[in-house]
Amino acid sequence: MRKSVIAGNWKMHMTCAETKNYLEEFIPLIKDLPNDRKIVIAPPFTAISTFSSYSNFDYLDIASQNIHWEDQGAFTAEISPKMLIEHNVKYAIVGHSEPRKYFSESDEQINKRAVFAQSSGLTPIVCVGETLEQRERGEANRVITRQVEQGLENTDPSNLIIAYEPIWAIGTGKTCEASDANKICALIRELIGFDDVIIQYGGSVKPNNIDEIMSMSDINGVLVGGSSLDPISFSRIANYE
């Protein structure tokens, strides 16, 4: 049986000192975590080495917030798999809506990152999602289909997590109805053609909606932004019922 993956994306938050304080409060809150789930946290690059000294638990792993498709070279501001693996990083987020928006990241680039992550021994968490305008025009399924087909070409679904993050729900307080999110996740599973692929939902996930989200048949985890910055809130999400 696949484990649920509860992932926190800290984005551009948390210094090394703040990371240490967070983990010292957070880890005792998840010590009795059920064995059907795993927690993954993506700290900023500067805090990864601090985090790595706390990641020797079976239920807690580190993710990178991005990854390049080469191991070294003249790629200013990028980071390579071998740099991350040195610090016990196991996962890498790729294709998040923010680099798609702010840096015009394409499905082709996302695919290169995902494929190289897998070939380097990391598990990519590939984000897909539609804008509010696309949703209102009835284009959500078409957009998701394109992102999955182009962004996940030549990837191994047995070493892959897909995060469905409707862009209009990220950091807005608006949450996609759990049943609607489940339909998109079912579509993604059908497109992948592998029943055991892990599919997360992301977008204003909070302690007061996690139980409903995780009750859905095709949702196997969550990718959490703001609520992962508070150890008490994130521990409640991790200990969903």
Curated annotation (Swiss-Prot):
Quick one: a GO cellular component term? cytosol
The UniProt entry annotates the active site at: H96, E165
E.C. number, please?
Answer: 5.3.1.1
Q: What class of enzyme is it?
A: isomerase
Organism domain of life: Bacteria
Q: Identify the pathway.
A: Carbohydrate biosynthesis; gluconeogenesis; Carbohydrate degradation; glycolysis; D-glyceraldehyde 3-phosphate from glycerone phosphate: step 1/1
Q: Which residues bind substrate?
A: N9, W10, K11, G171, S204, G225, G226
Task: Give the record's keywords alphabetically.
Answer: Cytoplasm, Gluconeogenesis, Glycolysis, Isomerase
Q: One Pfam annotation, family name?
A: TIM
Catalytic activity from the UniProt record: D-glyceraldehyde 3-phosphate = dihydroxyacetone phosphate
Give GO MF terms, alphabetically: triose-phosphate isomerase activity
Q: Where in the cell is it found?
A: Cytoplasm
Chief location: cytoplasm
- InterPro entries, alphabetically? Aldolase_TIM, TIM_sf, TrioseP_Isoase_bac/euk, Triosephosphate_isomerase, Triosephosphate_isomerase_AS
Covalent S-S links between cysteines? none
Family that this chain belongs to: Belongs to the triosephosphate isomerase family.
NCBIfam families attached to this UniProt entry: tim
Q: What does this protein do?
A: Involved in the gluconeogenesis. Catalyzes stereospecifically the conversion of dihydroxyacetone phosphate (DHAP) to D-glyceraldehyde-3-phosphate (G3P).
Oligomeric form and interacting partners = Homodimer.
Which named protein is this?
Triosephosphate isomerase
Which organism is the protein's source? Answer: Prochlorococcus marinus (strain MIT 9515)
Report which gene this protein is encoded by.
Answer: tpiA
